[in-house]
Amino acid sequence: MTRYKATISYDGYAFAGFQRQSHARSVQEEIEKTLTRLNKGQAITVHGAGRTDSGVHALGQVIHFDLPYQIDEEKLRFALDTQSPEDIDVISIELVADDFHCRYAKHSKTYEFIVDRGRPKNPMRRHYATHFPYPLDVERMQIAIKKLEGTHDFTGFTASGTSVEDKVRTITEASLIVDETGQFLTFTFSGNGFLYKQIRNMVGTLLKIGNNRMPVEQIALILEKKDRQLAGPTAAPNGLYLKEIRYEE
């Protein structure tokens, strides 16, 4: 068997998430169906580095799969790209070692979250940015977001009832920029891993801080108390993008 690593992007609007599901459309299943056709009907299993939720997009998701033969990477990329649905793009494919695993190999992830604060909202962006038409103090949010950097127990920012026991993660970058029109905010988070709904919960909290309904110090309090009830609401999934996954050499 020959193992291939692929970088893909997808529009998450019409998917119930990356992971295969029994009664809903998923990115994993669509790619497996295409690979199975290319493999003359013999089933191929796809593994993903991250499990994006329903409605979440990806600019640089990484997958791997095994084929019973070796083929030129660009020919394989072209075939997989052109025969996959239009809301999936295959950016690159490369041969990797047989023991490479896209999920367990040491890596970092970068996510972006886009907020549209336009009045009125832009209907063309409704599936690709979360609308928040209320007053926001960007400077307050820029101060608060920096308090998320570093190694912390992020229990207070994960979904209640998550089965993951170790909730300590390291965020190497947490930043917020505003585009030149002032309408779109981009939150960026890079780190060694993120908990279930962690980024959406952090963004929901930051928006509440920006709207002066929480103090800047709330971030430190949530990290200290590890209490989800102290954080803001979960931001909608449509603004979230898995931007990039980087593997250590």
UniProtKB/Swiss-Prot annotation:
Classify the source by domain of life.
Answer: Bacteria
Query: What SUPFAM superfamilies does its record include?
Result: Pseudouridine synthase
Residues given in the record as substrate binding sites: 111
Broadest EC class assigned to this enzyme: isomerase
Q: Which reaction does it catalyse?
A: uridine(38/39/40) in tRNA = pseudouridine(38/39/40) in tRNA
S-S bridge residues: none
Gene3D superfamilies to which the protein is assigned, alphabetical? Pseudouridine synthase I, catalytic domain, C-terminal subdomain (3.30.70.660), Pseudouridine synthase I, catalytic domain, N-terminal subdomain (3.30.70.580)
Q: Write the record's keywords in alphabetical order, separated by commas.
A: Isomerase, tRNA processing
- Entries under InterPro entries matching the protein: PsdUridine_synth_cat_dom_sf, PsdUridine_synth_TruA, PsdUridine_synth_TruA_a/b_dom, PsdUridine_synth_TruA_C, TruA/RsuA/RluB/E/F_N
GO BP, sorted A to Z: tRNA pseudouridine synthesis
What the protein does?
Formation of pseudouridine at positions 38, 39 and 40 in the anticodon stem and loop of transfer RNAs.
Q: Which family does it belong to?
A: Belongs to the tRNA pseudouridine synthase TruA family.
Oligomeric state and partners? Homodimer.
Q: What is this protein called?
A: tRNA pseudouridine synthase A
